Curated annotation (Swiss-Prot):
PANTHER family assigned: TRANSLATION FACTOR GUF1 HOMOLOG, CHLOROPLASTIC (PTHR43512:SF4), TRANSLATION FACTOR GUF1-RELATED (PTHR43512)
Its EC number(s): 3.6.5.n1
All residue ranges annotated as the tr-type G domain in the record: 7-189
Top enzyme category: hydrolase
Name of the gene encoding the protein in the UniProt record: lepA
Membrane topology: Peripheral membrane protein
Family annotation (HAMAP family): LepA
Catalyzed reactions: GTP + H2O = GDP + phosphate + H(+)
GO biological process, one term: positive regulation of translation
Entry-linked Gene3D superfamilies: 3.30.70.240, Elongation factor 4, C-terminal domain, Elongation Factor G (Translational Gtpase), domain 3, P-loop containing nucleotide triphosphate hydrolases, Translation factors
Protein name per the record: Elongation factor 4
Compartment annotation: Cell membrane
């Protein structure tokens, strides 16, 4: 049974597809409960990274406590945990849902249910959460709330008859949402007297307090001065501060079962406070840790190098700092003949990779070069040994390879039916295999495909959006590995291989990719005093070539008329000089050339 204190607590998060109005609804709830006055209000209050506001997306989950006076005259504590919507950040969503009893499902009144909405709903159902559907953007002329209600009931199977119809932008019917939270989301019921058990669902590094952990107290109580133990690492610390965010940090005496807040304990090393860990009382520990999060596996790898070699340690420090609150980022040191010392980093997807790169550049003032993104391939060698390859440079020679397998994803693509043909064409072009197709209603269709992850990570999402005028939506999950005819494509500049530009590609696309890279490099590398050949090769076979023409001095400028043999002699002399220069000269590849080639459309 919930205690009197717990009866007043509601822990919930907001889930939705990108752009369905999740952060705007969070802003309105904050405003309506009087937490921030309209004067201090700024759009996307919970998106406190500059990058999040700029891109209009939520990247990191945030938590905040609201106090709401309900119609029954009681004050309720509502702990809102904001979640991202992009497919790359599904792990952030699963983390925040683990700390809640309920979720608000925001659906756009014009767009309806999309692929990512479905994926997040399934995550919430797995955690046995109470889901409240809310239909947003009813102020739009194209809004069709009644149809959307039917869609929610038919596709997800949730009763949407009492779903609040709101406009988060205009602040319409926001009270209905708050009342629905109080009425429908169950209060926490855990035991306050049991030994402490708290779930770390996020953390960040503070220069003064050390690592600060966002936690949901599941059982027991945590107070200042108490000795706590991290169950995964067995490390012990003394709590220096506990409190809640409302919206800034507010210190409290204690956090008890059902509360969502933060704990600071002068933890200096980010590795000791892992997201998904359980915090317990060091003197009276709980027997079992909470069921941890599944460890997230990176899907995409790329090399990250400092533009100036001496900044190597700074990059390591920055990656360490980012890793504390981004459980999905993994990295290890590597070296490249072309770029020097750097790191091989693993990400969840291309958006995640871009975000990390931008955060490194902005928050830590680093100048970086990144190599082409690649996925993990499984290679069976002729001697039966199986190796996982994440860096194309480590691929064994062709003679040693028996089979190369590439990762395959199970993709669900939702599109308006008039775009189905274009999307099927796109999937076929990306070597997709159709597994099924069903109509949700007359106007929308659900396509089920198996696609190579290599084809999805580059620009599949962008291509899908542009071909469906923004209406297509995608959700995917790993399925496994499948044998494929893949080759390693090397780029040679002035007959020297540049390891940072090597990548693994399907045989059918090797020529187009190789030719595209040579053409792009030709535009980007400045001309030298000698001709520079640019070649794309598979093993020893050259499949594409471009030549950067030499800069030439006009050696005939001072020959006015005169004997032809004199001119020939001067030209011959110049030719010999160029030949000698080509043998000893080295070609500088500017950083801009690396960047533009790696952004090459695939």
């Amino acid at each position: 049974m919930p205690s009197d204190r717990q009866r007043k607590i509601r822990n919930f998060s907001i889930i939705a597809h990108i752009d369905h109005g999740k952060s705007t609804l969070a802003d309105r709830l904050i405003e309506r409960t009087g937490l921030i006055s309209q004067r201090e209000m700024q759009a996307q209050v919970l998106d406190n990274m500059e990058l999040e506001r700029e891109r209009g997306i939520t990247i990191k989950l945030q938590s905040i406590r609201l106090i709401y006076k309900a119609k029954d005259g009681q004050d309720y504590y509502l702990n809102l945990i904001d979640t991202p919507g992009h497919v790359d950040f599904t792990y952030e969503v699963s983390r925040s849902l683990a700390a809640c009893e309920g979720a608000i499902l925001v659906v756009d009144a014009a767009q309806g249910i999309e692929a990512q909405t479905m994926a997040n709903v399934y995550l919430a159902l797995e955690q046995n959460l109470e889901i409240i559907p809310v239909i947003n953007k009813i102020d739009l002329p194209s809004a069709r709330p009644d149809e959307i209600k039917r869609e929610i009931e038919d596709i997800i199977g949730l009763d949407a008859s009492e779903a609040p119809l709101i406009s988060a932008k205009d602040g319409l019917n926001i009270d209905d949402v708050l009342e629905a939270i109080v009425k429908n989301i169950p209060p926490p019921t855990e035991d306050e007297e049991a030994p402490l058990k708290a779930l770390v669902f996020d953390s960040y590094y503070d220069n003064y307090k050390g690592v600060v952990a966002y936690t949901r107290v599941v059982e027991g109580t945590v107070k200042k001065g108490m000795k706590i133990r991290m169950m995964a690492t067995k490390k012990e610390f003394e709590v220096t501060e506990v409190g809640v965010y409302s919206p800034g940090p507010i210190q409290l005496d204690q956090l008890s079962a059902g509360d969502v807040g933060y704990i600071a304990a002068s933890i200096k090393d980010v590795r000791y406070c892992r997201v998904g860990d359980t915090i317990t009382d060091a003197l009276n520990p709980t027997e079992h840790s909470l069921p941890g999060y599944r460890k997230v596996t990176p899907m995409v790898y790329c090399g990250v190098y400092p533009a100036e070699g001496e900044k190597y340690e700074d990059v390591r420090d920055a990656l360490d700092r980012l890793q504390v609150n981004d459980a999905a980022l993994v990295f290890e040191a590597e070296t490249s003949a072309a770029l020097g010392f750097g790191f091989r980093c693993g990400f969840l997807g291309l958006l995640h990779m871009e975000i990390i790169q931008e955060r490194l550049e902005r928050e830590f003032n680093l100048d970086l070069v990144t190599t082409a993104p690649s996925v993990i391939y499984r290679v069976t060698k002729t001697n039966g040994e199986v190796v996982m390859i994440q860096n194309p440079a480590n691929l064994p020679v062709t003679q040693e390879i028996s089979v190369i397998e590439e990762p395959i994803v199970k993709a669900t693509i939702m599109v308006p039916s008039e775009y189905a043909g274009i999307v099927i064409e796109l999937c076929q072009d990306r070597r997709g295999e159709m597994k099924g197709m069903d109509y949700i209603e007359e106007t929308r269709v659900n396509l089920h495909y198996e696609l190579p992850l290599n084809e999805v990570i580059y620009d599949f999402f962008d291509a899908l959006k542009s071909k469906t005028k923004g209406y297509g939506s995608l959700d995917y999950e790993m399925k496994g590995y499948k044998p494929s005819t893949l080759v390693k494509l090397d780029i040679l500049i002035n007959s020297e291989q540049v390891d940072a530009l090597s990548f693994i590609v399907h045989e059918s696309k090797a020529y187009a990719r190789g030719k595209g890279m040579c053409e792009k490099l030709k535009d980007e590398i400045p001309r030298h005093q000698f001709p520079v050949p640019l070649q794309a090769s598979i093993g020893t076979k050259i499949i594409a070539r471009e030549t950067i023409r030499a800069l030439r001095k006009d050696v005939l400028a001072k020959c006015y008329g005169g004997d032809i043999s004199r001119k020939k002699k001067l030209l011959e002399k110049q030719k010999k000089g160029k030949k000698r220069m080509r043998q000893v000269g080295s070609v500088e590849v500017p950083q801009k050339a690396f960047m533009s080639v790696l952004k090459l459309d695939t």
